[in-house]
A protein has these predicted regions:
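Short coil/turn connectors at secondary-structure junctions
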Residues: 54, 77, 97, 117-119
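Short loop/helix-cap segments at secondary-structure boundaries that form the rim of catalytic
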Residues: 67-75, 112
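Boundary-proximal intrinsically disordered activation/regulatory segments immediately upstream
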Residues: 1-67
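RNA substrate-binding interface of SAM-dependent RNA methyltransferases
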Residues: 2-5, 43, 50, 106-108, ...
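Glycine-rich phosphate-binding loops that contact phosphosugars or nucleotide phosphates
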Residues: 101
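Solvent-exposed alpha-helices and their adjacent loops that cap or buttress functional pockets
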Residues: 29-31, 92-94, 113-117
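A glycine-rich helix N-cap at a beta->alpha junction
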Residues: 73-92
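Phosphate- and divalent-cation-binding pockets in alpha/beta enzyme and binding domains
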Residues: 47, 67-68, 89, 132
């Protein structure tokens, strides 16, 4: 079960994974350097956790806890509970989907594994911001 940690200081170092997310270059550097990615919104957080990605932590306002209670119950990661104003201050944007999670990337499959049995393969080059 996740440990619930109430935080009221935007400078708390435990929130580092979520800091200044509007800066695409900073986010991409952080994600690549630390092998993590962020999920935003109840559905995406749920799907990422259910897909087996190791959860580093959760960040959410109190009103979103109930909707993800089953996911939190199945995780050992800390859940940082913050006000919506503090979430916006930390991330740099209004967290309108209510919940964020920091997850560890799993190793990528080899080219051979991707192509094995594939009928169609799509290659997308020069993607600057994968969220778009």
């Amino acid at each position: 079960m996740a440990t619930y940690v109430e935080i009221d200081d935007a400078a708390d170092p435990r929130l580092a994974d979520y800091r200044d997310l509007r800066d695409v270059q900073l986010r991409q550097s952080l994600e690549a350097e630390h092998g993590l990615f962020l999920a935003e919104g109840e559905k995406v957080v749920r799907r990422a956790a259910e897909a087996g990605f190791p959860v580093r932590s959760f960040l959410m306002a109190p009103r979103w806890l109930a909707g993800l209670a089953d996911v939190l119950d199945g995780s050992e990661a800390p859940c940082f509970v913050v006000s919506e104003a503090l979430a916006e201050q930390v991330t740099g944007f209004h967290v309108h989907r209510g919940a964020l999670a920091s997850l560890a990337r799993t190793p990528l499959p080899t080219v051979e594994e991707v192509l094995d049995g594939a009928r169609t393969v799509v290659v997308c080059e020069d993607i600057v911001d994968h969220t778009n």
